[in-house]
């Protein structure tokens, strides 16, 4: 397990118990550990969804079984989720020799990382920050694809609270640790030169609205979907990553090297599936938006704002996405948040 004896903090119904600063040493631990709010901490307690039969989970060590982990809701979204929903994934992978496909849902990237390290997953769909941090620790993963890039993060304030970054001095700001929103917040605070003047605490996105309503936090750095939704509910937006070069996120698909050693042609086959799914969801955008809204429980007009389909990549490594990913990696390394540097070209799987 990737865990350290550190107080990461959590939020009770009435107040924060966390006393975490934004010092780089603490943030490094935040980025490499899982959450501690009674959420899922390892693959042993994640929700496994088998496209064939629950009994096949026991056969997860078989080469004929593909174990996919993802961060998010009851079902994956984006090209992976669409490929699953439309039957593209099942059809093509069965032809490739996979008899069983299992899906495990995780609340955040660090928890998914733990499952990859433990050998409980073959493939992971997650954000750039946890994926980079894991690779920088020397874990043997390979980058298969950038599925989405320029994903916006938002900094939303409580009502009747601060309206500018300067007004956040001396305040508590929350975000979901180890996420692309976390990296955005760290970069934003560094740009504004107020990193030492605020307290950053961990809070899952599912608890953000209630915490803002109670006034437990002055602001919350949140995801592309939740940001516009909170704005529609009257919460002021202080900032978004769209206002800053290099602070938006990318979504990645990685695989373990041990799995790829057994399935060397998997990157090409899997990327072909996701490319087909990406093109199909764009060609059927209204149907996809309805699916995405159903899964995330946000109104469809919010989804259309939060997810311009131009962010969905039709190729494995789009140039714009690679540039953004390189910038994120450099930031994490320069701040000591990623343990070591590496070349993206070395990380990328060869097709």
Task: Show where each model-derived region lies.
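Flexible hinge/capping segments at coil-to-helix
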Residues: 157-173, 259-268
